UniProtKB/Swiss-Prot annotation:
Residues 602-611 have a biased composition (Low complexity). Acts as a chaperone. The keyword Protein biosynthesis does not apply. Residues 612-631 have a biased composition (Acidic residues). This is Chaperone protein DnaK. The gene is dnaK. NCBIfam families: PRK00290.1, prok_dnaK. It comes from Bifidobacterium longum subsp. infantis (strain ATCC 15697 / DSM 20088 / JCM 1222 / NCTC 11817 / S12). It comes from the Bacteria. CDD domains: ASKHA_NBD_HSP70_DnaK-like.
Amino acid sequence: MARAVGIDLGTTNSCIATLEGGEPTVIVNAEGARTTPSVVAFSKSGEILVGEVAKRQAVTNVDRTISSVKRHMGTDWTVDIDGKKWTPQEISAQILMKLKRDAEAYLGEPVTDAVITCPAYFNDAQRQATKDAGKIAGLNVLRIINEPTAAALAYGLEKGKEDERILVFDLGGGTFDVSLLEIGKDDDGFSTIQVQATNGDNHLGGDDWDQKIIDWLVSEVKNKYGVDLSKDKIALQRLKEAAEQAKKELSSSTSTSISMQYLAMTPDGTPVHLDETLTRAHFEEMTSDLLGRCRTPFNNVLHDAGISVSDIDHVVLVGGSTRMPAVKDLVKELTGGKEANQSVNPDEVVAVGAAVQSGVIKGDRKDVLLIDVTPLSLGIETKGGIMTKLIDRNTAIPTKRSEVFSTAEDNQPSVLIQVYQGEREFARDNKPLGTFELTGIAPAPRGVPQIEVTFDIDANGIVHVSAKDKGTGKEQSMTITGGSGLPKDEIDRMVKEAEAHEAEDKQRKEDAETRNQAEAFAYSTEKLVNDNKDKLSDDIVKEVTDKVNALKEALKGDDTEKVKTAQTELMTAAQKIGQVLYAQQGAEGAAAGAGAAGAAGAGASAGSASGSDDDTVEAEVVDDDDDKDNK
């Protein structure tokens, strides 16, 4: 049976884990690392690079390298590469395919089923886009679960005792979530993890802290050299990498040096060099507004759950950005001096929790029940542009709610159902999820027809809406796919393209290996000829040398079949060298053997002669004819 995995599809880094013997294990990637950079690049040759290898070449390939694509999930953003428009789902699918390949290599078996995480505050369109990305990558997405919930799942099973209230503070590379969960364990060790409230900001994360450093560096260069680096893509990429490194160093040091040579040139040809020192105090001062934005979601969660800070038993920090001292201090301040739990790895805990949930769904773990919530209220637009909520935020999912509405005009033949997600009073201020029309309503005065609108949120947090005219029985339904809505045929096309790209990449790898082997064989054969020229006939030397040159010539081109043919011909010719050398070796061995036998015979005669004085009696040979003559 194919293995199920848990995947944390992150803004900056991604991680994959699985259950081994019922216990979660983080899977090491092909490069030997436990996390994979969420970076995708398209090389000039058309090869798709993912992870560390894509990140390393970003400076020299800025326009064809995509990072932090998670921030575009659920939007109509695209990137044009060689005339093809790539959606966020397709870029994310490349990251998932890399994780899938590495997991299959690690486990030695196919990986098809996955639980993929997303920020708790992701709206419906973003969740649907995440699920579509998994589908394009060739995965059967068992469930989409919230990142803080996954973290609590991983933490709670290991550390949780009876009825503990856990606050998960999740600040990643691009998103921020706060979730409050209650973990209960019965006498049999069965855990129930229930989300009580969640809140967040989908556009707040480590990338924003990096950007503050970049802006500061750009400003310093402008003041010193009069050069605006904000328009220079290559310089900006170098600054981005330096800013990220500086941010990390300031988590353990009170200051860091940022030094870069030849960033750009001034109009008069003077090279732009950068050599700045950034202190932690200055960094915290320039990012204080970002830190302030973390307060509101925290306070909202406590308000929605109806609890005070003293009711929180444990605080769990998730996401690499929580390593920043200012963030840790803020959490301590917000929670009334509580020390955050340091027992979980903030980069891996989400994937570990997702792996546990995959085991629960597949039946490998029967000791836990997870109850999640919808992060945003759902409703429809009614007369006057009002947002009429059918499902309030923080409602446990899956859930289903219905409400009866009517027409606004006499003899109205149809109604337009406009679905929104959000907390504002007017529909226009919320996120539009989709629109559909219920037609064929029987003529009647306004307010008479009864139209039942039903919202159904599944365990992935994805919304299904239906409307039914109770008078005529006519019904219309839709699955909300949001602004990024990809129809099924579009997803199927993307799946096929992704498979084709994977096949192309595999072929490209095989071709590269063929060329490497051919090149090595050409040079080893050439060396063999040069080392044994005195033992080989001129004909053989010429034939093999010609074949070596033919193979080298084939290697200059792009035709792999030509390389294979040339290598086969060289192999055939090179066999003659082996035959000659082995034949000569055999002849030399035979000659040496004959010489040794002769020497042994001579030794035997000498031995006989030397022994004649002893007890040896020599026979006398008598010639009969000679004897007769003598008589």
